[in-house]
């Protein structure tokens, strides 16, 4: 009340005025904060777009262009090895491979390929990964031991992955009328997985159909195999040119003799030489896709993320190829002189990898 002598009335009026002004100021700030929030969200979205564009720019940058070229060329070379038998195998060679002399020639190539695979694993891939693991570990011996155990686990993972691929794509769809061949000559043609020709009792048409299916299944397995090779080649070039070149050379040493066997299987399935060559050439697409997949999924943290798992994983895959697909064919040799020649060729393959390591940087 005006003119009220009570001091409490003046204090209450001042408090009411203060609260009113404070409420008006808060409402004004709340109304003005919405544009600020909208601008903050727009800025965050802009940063995300910039980050995504930077990642794509780094993927297609000039520094990565060299890796793209080397990886695609290496994968293409591995894929084109399927056409190589067309250049060296005469028309009658398909029949010659079924003989004992042809099987022995194939085992000679496989012995050299086995040495190249083992040399690449134990002289290049695993030492490179081991040295990197020991050098970058910041902790004590416990953390270093843990890193080394992870390296061993990646080797086992690579071995089991290749085992699973062979189980799924080679053995799951075998025709019941096709029994495994006991002939070591036939087994040498396709890594121990050549099948005996079914009996002609159901009719010639059924025989031809079964042979065609076996040829197409072999092409499917070859495409999957080339995809894993493309992964290995591209991932190795992401580490260094030296590792990439050595890996490509090791794959070629393994692939060329096996492609001869795959080519013979296609001839046996009823394809002519040119059709078999074109089908083998089409499997090279799997290697290119594998190389692109490996590069596009590369971690932005750099090469160190690749070395940790790619090198031991690839080593496990190569060990599976060498010890499961190649070595059993060589153990079937009974002649001591031929066995000695196989051991010498195996050592020659290892020596080639040693020389490549010394002269290729």
Swiss-Prot record:
Gene that this sequence comes from: Slc39a13
Protein name stated in the entry: Zinc transporter ZIP13
Tissues expressed in: Highly expressed in some tissues such as bone and eye. Expressed in osteoblasts of tibia and of alveolar bone, in proliferative zone of growth plate, and in odontoblasts on the forming of the dentine of crown in molar tooth. Also expressed fibroblasts in reticular layer of dermis of skin.
Listed transmembrane segments: 7-27, 69-89, 109-129, 151-171, 233-253, 276-296, 307-327, 340-360
Residue span of motif XEXPHE-motif: 254-259
Main location: Golgi
Subunit: Homodimer.
Stated role: Functions as a zinc transporter transporting Zn(2+) from the Golgi apparatus to the cytosol and thus influences the zinc level at least in areas of the cytosol. May regulate beige adipocyte differentiation.
Consequence of gene loss (knockout): Homozygous knockout mice for Slc39a13 show growth retardation and results in a generalized skeletal and connective tissue disorder, namely develop progressive kyphosis after 3 or 4 weeks of age.
Family of the protein in this entry: Belongs to the ZIP transporter (TC 2.A.5) family.
Sequence ranges on the Cytoplasmic membrane side: 28-68, 130-150, 254-275, 328-339
Reactions listed under catalytic activity: Zn(2+)(in) = Zn(2+)(out)
Organism: Mus musculus (Mouse)
């Amino acid at each position: 009340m005006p003119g009220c002598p009570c001091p409490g009335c003046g204090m209450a009026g001042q408090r009411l005025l203060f609260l009113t002004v404070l409420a008006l100021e808060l409402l004004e700030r709340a109304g003005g904060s919405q544009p600020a929030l909208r601008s903050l969200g727009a800025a965050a979205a802009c940063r995300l777009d910039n980050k995504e564009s930077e990642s794509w720019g780094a993927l297609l940058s000039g520094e990565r262009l060299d890796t793209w070229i080397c990886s695609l060329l290496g994968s293409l070379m591995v894929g084109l090895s399927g056409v190589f038998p067309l250049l060296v195998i005469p028309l009658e060679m398909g029949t010659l491979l079924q003989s004992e002399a042809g099987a022995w020639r194939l085992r000679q190539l496989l012995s050299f390929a086995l040495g190249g695979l083992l040399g690449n694993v134990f002289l290049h891939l695993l030492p490179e990964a081991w040295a990197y693991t020991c050098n970058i570990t910041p902790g004590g011996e416990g953390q270093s031991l843990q890193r080394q155990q992870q390296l061993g686990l990646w080797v086992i993972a690579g071995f089991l992955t290749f085992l699973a691929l062979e189980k799924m794509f080679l053995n799951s769809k075998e025709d019941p009328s096709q029994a495994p061949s006991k002939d070591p000559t036939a087994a040498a043609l396709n890594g121990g997985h050549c099948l005996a020709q079914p009996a002609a009792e159901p009719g010639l048409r059924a025989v031809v159909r079964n042979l065609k299916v076996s040829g197409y299944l072999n092409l499917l397995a070859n495409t999957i195999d080339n995809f894993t090779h493309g992964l290995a080649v591209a991932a190795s070039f992401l580490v260094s040119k030296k590792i990439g070149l050595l890996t490509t050379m090791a794959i070629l040493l393994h692939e060329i003799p096996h492609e001869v066997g795959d080519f013979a299987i296609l001839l046996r399935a009823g394809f002519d030489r040119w059709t078999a060559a074109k089908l083998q050439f089409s499997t090279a697409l799997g290697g290119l896709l594998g190389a692109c997949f490996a590069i596009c999924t590369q971690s932005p943290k750099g090469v160190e993320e690749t070395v940790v798992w790619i090198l031991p994983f690839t080593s496990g895959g190569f060990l599976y190829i060498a010890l499961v697909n190649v070595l059993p064919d060589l153990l079937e040799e009974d002649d001591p002189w031929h066995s000695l020649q196989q051991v010498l060729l195996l050592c020659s393959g290892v020596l080639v990898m040693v020389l490549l390591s010394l002269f290729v940087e």
